[in-house]
């Protein structure tokens, strides 16, 4: 049983490439295909423009994106809320990888060499905030 709240009525799990597009739109707001395409190319090896265009069209059909066609350049925006999508994905991850146990996830994170002293301090502060509630 997971401790994460899931919004199963609107639960949609984007693919890795769909998440890449959503991340750009969440970070920069409504954008043209060209802008999203350029940002994706900054993040990884060359992506073909027509592939980005087709992906965003499919995401619109799935209800993940909205398209403003009022000007010559179509502007896309994310319909899915970042917090909900990431919460759903995190819940699924914890369920499948850590038997629904957030504490098992935290133990794995804290035992990881990638966790810096600064990040550990942030975690301690978060735990203090949770304890004081």
Language model features with spans:
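Short helix-coil junctions and helix-kink-helix linkers
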Residues: 39-47
């Amino acid at each position: 049983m997971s401790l994460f709240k899931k919004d199963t009525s609107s639960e949609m799990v984007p693919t890795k490439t769909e998440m890449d597009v959503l991340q750009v739109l969440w970070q920069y707001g409504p954008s043209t295909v060209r802008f999203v395409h350029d940002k994706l190319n900054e993040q990884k090896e060359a992506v073909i423009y027509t592939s980005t265009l087709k992906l965003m069209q499919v995401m619109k059909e799935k209800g993940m994106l909205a398209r403003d066609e009022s000007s010559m350049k179509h502007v896309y925006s994310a319909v899915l809320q970042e917090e909900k999508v990431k919460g759903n994905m995190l819940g699924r991850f914890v369920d499948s990888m850590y038997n629904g146990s957030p504490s098992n996830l935290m133990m794995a994170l804290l035992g990881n060499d990638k966790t810096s002293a600064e990040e550990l301090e942030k975690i301690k502060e978060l735990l203090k905030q949770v304890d004081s509630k």
